[in-house]
Amino acid sequence: MAASTTAQILVVSLGLLIFVLLCPWFGYLRLPSSMRWWPSIPSGPLSALRLSLKEYSGSRSSEDGYKAFSKKAELFAICNPSFYPQVLLPPEQIPWLLSQPENVLSHEKANEDVHALPFLAPAFDNYDHLELIRAIRTDLTRNIPNTEDAFLDELRHTTNEVLGAPGDNAWKEVNLTVALDSIIFGICLRLFFGVSLSRNRTFVYYVKIFTRVTGAMMLFVSQLVPWPLKPVVGIVAGFPIYYYWVRLIIYLYPTFKERIQCLRTKKETPPADMVTWMVDLAISQNPTRKVHISSLIVRLTLIVFLPVDVLIAMTDNFFLDLLSSDPDRKYYNALRQEAEAAFTNRDKTQPISQSMPYMESTIRESLRLSPLSDRMLSRRVVHKGGITLPDGQFLPRGTWLAVAAVGVHRDERTYEDPDEYRPFRFLSEDTETKEAKAMLVPVTSEKFLAFGHGRHSCPGRWFAAHAMKLIIGYILVNYDIEPLEKRPVNSVVGQTIIPQLDVKIRVRRRE
């Protein structure tokens, strides 16, 4: 009996394995025979499997395919580690892509593919969550001027600890990513929860561990696990996320409870922070219902913690680009002088970050060269009858679409010498005042996709741009940093582009 059961288990397991390994070929067969493929058309099940497995090694298929097809206004398909192919549209079809309604091409369904929450937390209501994200980040953007004093206070505190306090003028070697991690997390937690929690080492530890574990599991399940295995692997991968959710609920529950009481009684003015905005929104949506604190905390952790790592990576790329640029061009000094003037002439009626066009252009250039994903504008075909593209190509329901962002950003038809780092590329001159001006960092277009484009552009991009300008400007004004000999090459994991995490820099406090 035991032997028979074992044999049945082996047969079922073998059948499942064969099915999983055949999935790349099934994906190929779903698409029209006229579809172009990069780097080659799968010639059979083993060929499709090999092309999919190749993507695990950080292949730049989307960028190379862009050069071969998209520059000729042709779409193409590539295999993925998830064993489900993706169709990449040329830039000429971006306006059409953005014009399609949600019930035809779904951004939300594609978003589920990217963050894998339906697999990691099946009971999580993603649609209510997305509405909350938009509302909360609107509050965050609107309150940028009101939070600048707290921002600068925490910026001074964290940089003193990490890079050196006034009077400490000795050169020191620090890990760039670790330093930015401490500075940026400190600032964000100060704005989200206030000074007491932002400097509570145990709380900060749990926040960082939760962020890293959740981000890693999202990337792993969404981009590296074959799609038939996602439901099972996702549930297992979600266990550590639930554990840290419980730890964070224990820490944050008293703060949320106190804030609910404050807003309901209206006896005191609550702090202008993320907790207040979130509780206020929850109460305004359902004035007569009880606010479920644990649910709010779970949503908050996803809204504000995970994007902090994105901000760290963008700032990391900025410094890697700047420090590896030609010292003779004196980009560092030009940005320092601009930042010194902005901080010295601070006008409390508007953010400091509004008076730094050179910084604006330099950040935008780093985002152009190093977006954090090689594909943007993801959509999933959800219309039952499929969809016909502007060039007449038909795609069945379930097809995953995107645009090769790195290819768009490095297209010589749009950008002169696109592979060259030109930090002041986006500068121009005001025709009336003759002063320098720059395209704002958060402004998206069909040629600049670092934050996406259209109505689903990253809702936190205005705060991210403001934060980067203040943090970078303050560091440039107060610290000397030795140049890097060459720019460390970013890594590619699935569709995600990650800066090198082990780069050491030499830094000292200025007199």
UniProtKB/Swiss-Prot annotation:
Glycosylation sites: N175, N200
Expression triggers: Expression is regulated by a complex signaling network which may include cross-pathway interactions mediated by sensing of the cluster final products or shared biosynthetic intermediates.
Pathways involved: Secondary metabolite biosynthesis
UniProt keyword Transmembrane present: yes
Membrane topology field: Single-pass membrane protein
Positions that bind heme: C458
Listed EC numbers: 1.-.-.-
Cofactor(s) needed for function: heme
UniProt-listed Gene3D superfamilies: Cytochrome P450 (1.10.630.10)
GO MF annotation list: heme binding; iron ion binding; monooxygenase activity; oxidoreductase activity, acting on paired donors, with incorporation or reduction of molecular oxygen
InterPro entries on file: Cyt_P450 (IPR001128), Cyt_P450_CS (IPR017972), Cyt_P450_E_grp-IV (IPR002403), Cyt_P450_sf (IPR036396)
Family, similarity comment: Belongs to the cytochrome P450 family.
Protein name per the record: Cytochrome P450 monooxygenase lnaD
Species of the source: Aspergillus flavus (strain ATCC 200026 / FGSC A1120 / IAM 13836 / NRRL 3357 / JCM 12722 / SRRC 167)
Lineage of source species: Eukaryota, Fungi, Dikarya, Ascomycota, Pezizomycotina
